[in-house]
Structure formats: C-alpha cells, structure tokens
Amino acid sequence: MGLALAFESSCDETGVALVENGRRVIAAPLFSQIAMHRPYGGIVPEYASRAHLEKFTPLLSEILTAHNLKPGDLDYVAVTTRPGLIGALLVGYQSARACARFFKAPLIGVHHLEAHLAAVRLSGHETPFPALGLMLSGGNSAIYELKKPGDIRVMGDTLDDAAGEALDKAAQILGLGYPGGPRIEERAEAFALSRGITPGHENNLDSENIFPVILKSLRRDKVEFSFSGIKTALLRAYESAAEKNIDALAFFYQERIVEHITRNLSHALEIAGKKPVIAAGGVLANKRLRRSLEGICRKFGVQLLIPEFRYCTDNAAMVAAAAQLYFENNLKSPYSDVQSGNAFLSA
C-alpha cells in the first residue's frame, strides 16, 4: 500500500493529487496557466509562481474536504523538486512540506522527468526495468537508460532546443499562437486531409518535403537531438515564400521533427539492445509521433509504453507514481532539496 498526497508546480501547471499505491488516482485537481501566459507567447516565471501560490490552497482544500483526511492517514507526501522554474518549485515544495508535517508523513522529493516516465503506472503498467526512456517536453528531449528504481542514466540529450520548444517557436514563426504543439498538429492534419493522406501514410508526401533532414549523418557511438537547424529552415522558408501555405509548412515541419525523434530512438535501440521503451512528456500528445514510435518499436520487437493523454502533460498524479517506486523499494530519494538543474542522481 501507499496512500500519497502529491504536488506538482515545476512550470505552468498547478497540481495536487491523492493517489493510492502509486497507481490508482483517487483525485487529481489541476489548474492550467496556459490562458494566462498565452498573451506573452510563452511562460513568464514570476506570473507562474504567483499563480501557484494562489491556486494550491483551493486545490488542496478540494481534496481534503472530499476525502476527510486526518493526521496518520497518509503514508507519504510527494513533491517535484527539480528541474523547473525555481520560484514555482519552491511554492510547491513549501506546500508539500507543510502538509507532510501536518499529516505526520515523510516527504519524498521527485525528479520531474522520472515522474513523467513513471506516469505509465497510472494506466496499470509496471515500469519494466531495465528499459529505455524517451523524454519529450517543452524543456527536455533526451533518451535515458532506466537500470532499476532510482537509477536512471542519460544516454543522449539535445544539443540545443527541446522538441516542445521547437514546436512552440515554429508556431510563433507561423503566427499560430501558444502553445505551439497542438497548433502545429492541427494545421498539419488539415494539410494531410486536403491532400487525401490518411493517418499512417504521411510518408507518401516525403518527396515534397522542403526541409532538410536533421543531422542526417548521426554519430554511431552516441544519441543526439538537435532542432535548431530545422527551426531556422522554417523561418527562411516562411520569409521567402511569396504565398505562405501555413498548413503545408506545419505539415512538413512536423514530419521532420517526428523523423528525427524516431531515428534517434532506433539508434538508441541499436546501441542499448532490445529493451522496452517508455515514451513520456507533453510532446507525446502528438498523434503523428505516437504512430511513428509504435512503428519503430514493432520493427525492433519491443514493448512501447506511453501514458494516457491526460497524464502526458504535467500533473501531480505522476509525481506520486514516481515516489511510490522509492516507497515500495525502501529507497531514499536523492531529490530532497529544490534545484533547477536536471541531473539524475542515484538512490
């Protein structure tokens, strides 16, 4: 067992969750700040911290009122302590620490990225150690080796932008607004529909792709992501086009992003051997990317685990899912203090 109250505030989502055994979500109220940040074209850290400060109390009250929790009822309190916006992290940490004291429960700090990778547990899956973890979000694009609970090692990282950041910046270039990922996907789907391309057959148009292949000559001894070149190519194509076909630009840009990600995953499987793959992070809400990853994993004959759509983006339930791995394996979390860095530590 393990009844947990969890807190998430690493960026622009304020989340509190009551989770049993790191798997069954009892309640998970969430406040999204997207509408608040949209006029600025991105996240304003100070505004994010203030919003967390305002929203944690009503979200927490919602859970406490509905479930009548008393001191001694919780097995632990979990909270994201890194990486993220330092002010936002501190708001969540102080809220969690106060609750841990009130409920007389231990506080377990969690790495935000390990929480994303643990989100598959909320859908009834166990984390299949050893495994590969593909993390794709607004701030991170990397592949990890999951050795055992509390032991995650970086296999390959991004040289510049993250995938989610590349999509957000592309949407800005094309005048589609924030957040960029869903906007790019919508316009790409519209273009495919206009050309009679059904899901799963997007490669039929690859000969028309106006963008260069990203890092076509990959190093064979390591995995690397890089999205700055394709972003620059999009800007040049947009500025030089006499007639700006936004749908076409979005479609071919998305195709190159997806191709780059899947080539890197394929490369990682060749290096590390056939291991189950856990793919996580907000970018995994992209249906085109999901289909491509499924194809690569079928080719290698390995299992692909992706969280449900609602658990792909930041939420507190995934924080409890990650903390449960420490709790049930009697491990001490190495993430007890708040930091902005994203380095993994061993338990």
Pin down the residues of each PLM region.
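Short beta-strand scaffold segments in enzyme catalytic cores
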Residues: 14-19, 133-135, 141-145
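A contiguous, well-structured pocket-lining segment that forms one wall/lid of small-molecule binding clefts
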Residues: 187-193, 204-277, 286-300, 327-330, ...
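Short Gly/Thr/Asp-enriched flexible loops that form oxyanion-binding sites at enzyme active sites
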Residues: 79-104, 287-295
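Conserved phosphate-binding/catalytic loops in two-lobed NTP-binding clefts
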Residues: 109-110, 294-319
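Glycine-rich phosphate-binding loop plus the immediately following alpha-helix
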Residues: 125, 148-189, 232, 236-242
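N-terminal beta-alpha supersecondary unit
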Residues: 2-73, 79-83, 112, 116
